[in-house]
Amino acid sequence: MVSSVSRRFLARAAVLTLVSASAWSVPASAAPPVTGPLAANPFLGPLGTATMHGDAGSSDVTPLAGPAAGAGVTVYPLGAACPTLLEGADGLVVGLCTAIAGQTPTVFLFDTAAPGPVGGALASLPLTKGSLLGGVYAFLDNEDRLVVVDGARRLLRVAHVRGDDGAWRLTATVQSDLSGVIPQGDNVTGLVPDWSGNVWFATGHGVVGFVGRDGGVGTVRLPSGESVANSISSAPNGGVAVASTHALYELRAKNSEPEILWRAAYDRGAARKPGQLSWGTGSTPTYFGPVRGDEYLAIVDNADDQVRLIVARSGSGEQVCSIPVPVGGSENSPIAIGSSIFVASTYGYPYPTVPEGAGPAVPANAPFHGGLSRVDLTADGCVPVWDSRVRSAAVPRLSLADGGIHTLRRVGPDSATPLDGFDYVVVDPETGAVRTSTHLPGTVAEDPLQMAALITRGGALWQGTVTGIVRIG
């Protein structure tokens, strides 16, 4: 949910009506530096900017540097929530947003160099409407085309071209009609290519499959009652990870059909937690590891008393560790690279709406205290490193270039009010301390709703909000 579902939500939330903290439990000395490999999928656009979570493995890590201190702010008032913002090799930003009026998914094209305090789109293209979370997740392929499944259950590739008149246009080509394998009323919530070029998808009602490069389609259905509310991930080893509302799966393509390699149930708790969008994990599963970048998978469960970070071995599903994290609950995909994992709390986050069928939250609401935790995977298992009180209001993004975790922080009382504001902050991954903080204009009309940010090659951070985009830098 991107995740997210992308997570990351929401277009999730667009759908709706408008309506300083420091680190604690910090070790005496800084933790080891965070580093590790990022696997570049040959069928995706640039590493770090082609998917909601940065790459096919959903690391939420980028090789690019974020904004410098004191960078200017540009607001894009689009009348739409923008959970998916991606940058292609041509340096243009493509957004997949959901219009507040009519809840129509819309593709936008933006110029990253546009000056001024208020920005706009170069072109837009409405898509067929589906569910609240259907179409939230998309990716840019290696030709800078947006790959998405629309509400009519068609796999589209949306290209942007500049005409002789200088105007930009968005054009959609149907790659595959999936209405024969995805039932009416069901929608795709996760989408990713594997290393062979198959485009994998997962639906809210538990259909998992892929469209092959030859156009063939293969599917498998998860057990009755299991749904998929977050996006999916792929790895160089051929694996594709899916987290349902009950279990973590790893699959692969075999003889033109998806094969389930293993299934590992997790503690989904007694009900949906406040600040989450489904009853179960809020994680898009994250591939990571110190050698290839795909040795392990990480998710956060939904246990009642205290949620746990779960790390499983890719390929076998063997549980490597399970450790409590003091975040209450998380709707965000973990950041993970090398041997380090970061988990952000969304427990109590005031989403204005939740997907149909999400079920009641227990309790119905709760204060949003926030929190960000680092856990390292060692020879002895998972070891807690630090916990921070940062009230992250977006999916945090770790930059390997500048060594900071970039996010937006909600400012106001823990109970959350319409007068709350937001800061752009950079957190030190070695200590959990806030390095820099910049106050942003606006209040809940610019709520990032736990959506993922994009860091561009030009060093700007683009953050989707409930009404459009805030660009820093």
Residue ranges and their predicted role:
Residues I100-D111, A152-G163, H205-G212, H246-R252, ...:
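Structural motif
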Residues V2-L127, G135-V136, N142-R145, G468, ...:
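Sequence/structural signature of beta-propeller modules
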Residues A68, A121-G130, R169-Q184, I260-S278, ...:
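Surface-exposed loop and turn segments in beta-propeller and other repeat-based domains
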Residues V93-L96, R145-V149, N198-A202, G239-V242, ...:
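Conserved beta-propeller blade signature
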Residues C97, E295-I299, N332-T443:
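Loop/turn-rich, solvent-exposed surfaces of beta-rich toroidal or solenoidal domains
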Residues L122-G134, A152-R153, A159-S196, T203-H205, ...:
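Asp-box/WD-like beta-propeller blade repeats and closely related beta-sheet repeat scaffolds
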Residues P77-E87, P126-N142, L178-V192, G225-P236, ...:
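Repeated scaffold domains used in trafficking and secretory/extracellular systems
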